[in-house]
């Protein structure tokens, strides 16, 4: 399986967690917590997380990662912009002989990537298929707010671990990806956040015995992080409703299915994500599908956005690599409808 395929699958996994999260379970918490994921989800994590991506290290780590992820080279300007919006941390903690270092993180306020270095005790080989925790990590700020919980304690996001790169026998790079679809007014760059890792596990795939996990430590690692100011910049593209054709009812976007007019009420674009809020008078409360949409850049390049969750009033889309909001000219839909970026604020 290619790195691109596994990245796509990991996004599907994140969405599974988000769907589960929106089921209404309240889990108020202000620190480390054990939120056990179902056995099926753990198995899916293990299947999808085993990949080695050839990336470089240092200040351009995320630039190299996003270039690999998107399958296209990034310009020097893109790399500089990604570097300026990357939080460099470099803090380590040791529990039961295992050192975890939070190296850096990148976010647009809706999707976040945290890069960790895991170092095992000398003489211990990190040769399992998967490392991390089968529990959602807790990320809280100084005010007690959780990155993926709303004020009532309900899930508004999800996340998962990914094995990225092996440095040497007892060192590997891990990536934790998280989505947060918190809809209230909240800034993430004006406060210090604390990332908790509650326990360390390893996992194996075995064709005969199936998948199995083993706990390496019951310790809790915690890291403070402050995101760069301006990383969560958002542009609203809609001043009045725009009508496009979509398929209602969750059916695949295909000419064989009837397409109905859907009013787009809001189109909020960030470096990694686009949130589209919509309404259909014909079938209220029914999910819509607009298929693949594109960000058309000023240089003519069309960058596809991948759907990442559909709800009765909203669709979330993802970019494979952060875009420069100042260089986006318009959003293009499958039916030819265009939402221009008239002014960027």
Task: Give each language-model segment a name.
Residues 1-31:
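Disordered, charged N-terminal biogenesis/targeting segments of membrane/secreted proteins
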Residues 22, 29-38, 104-111, 267:
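Short, charged N-terminal helix-start/capping segments
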Residues 53-345:
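Alpha-helical, hydrophobic structural elements that either
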């Amino acid at each position: 399986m290619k790195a691109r395929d596994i990245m796509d699958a990991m996004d599907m996994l994140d969405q599974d967690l988000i769907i589960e999260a929106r089921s209404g379970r309240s889990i108020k918490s202000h620190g480390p917590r054990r939120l056990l994921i179902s056995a099926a989800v753990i198995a899916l994590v293990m299947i999808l997380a085993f990949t080695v991506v050839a990336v470089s290290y240092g200040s351009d780590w995320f630039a190299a990662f996003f270039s690999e992820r998107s399958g296209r080279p990034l310009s020097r300007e893109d790399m500089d912009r990604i570097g300026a919006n990357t939080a460099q941390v470099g803090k380590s903690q040791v529990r039961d002989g295992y050192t975890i270092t939070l190296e850096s993180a990148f976010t647009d306020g809706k999707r976040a990537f945290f890069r960790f270095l895991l170092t095992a005790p000398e003489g211990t080989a990190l040769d399992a298929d998967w490392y991390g925790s089968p529990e959602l990590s807790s990320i809280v700020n100084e005010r007690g707010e959780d990155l993926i919980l709303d004020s009532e304690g309900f899930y508004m996001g999800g996340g998962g671990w990914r094995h990225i790169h092996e440095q040497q026998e007892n060192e590997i790079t891990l990536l934790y990806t998280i989505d947060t679809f918190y809809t209230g007014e909240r800034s993430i760059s004006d406060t210090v956040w604390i990332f908790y890792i509650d326990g360390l596990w390893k996992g194996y795939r075995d064709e005969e015995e199936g998948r199995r996990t083993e706990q390496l430590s019951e310790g809790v690692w915690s890291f403070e992080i402050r995101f760069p100011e301006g990383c969560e910049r958002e542009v609203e593209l809609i001043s009045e409703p725009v009508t496009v054709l979509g398929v209602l009812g969750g059916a695949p976007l295909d000419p064989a299915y009837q397409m109905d007019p859907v009013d787009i009420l809001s189109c909020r674009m960030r470096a990694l994500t686009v949130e589209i809020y919509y309404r259909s008078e014909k079938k209220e409360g029914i999910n819509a599908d607009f298929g693949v949409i594109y960000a058309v850049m000023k240089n003519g390049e069309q960058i596809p956005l991948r759907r990442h969750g559909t709800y009765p009033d909203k669709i979330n889309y993802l970019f494979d690599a952060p875009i420069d909001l100042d260089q986006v000219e318009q959003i293009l839909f499958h039916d030819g409808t265009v939402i221009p970026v008239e002014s960027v604020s």
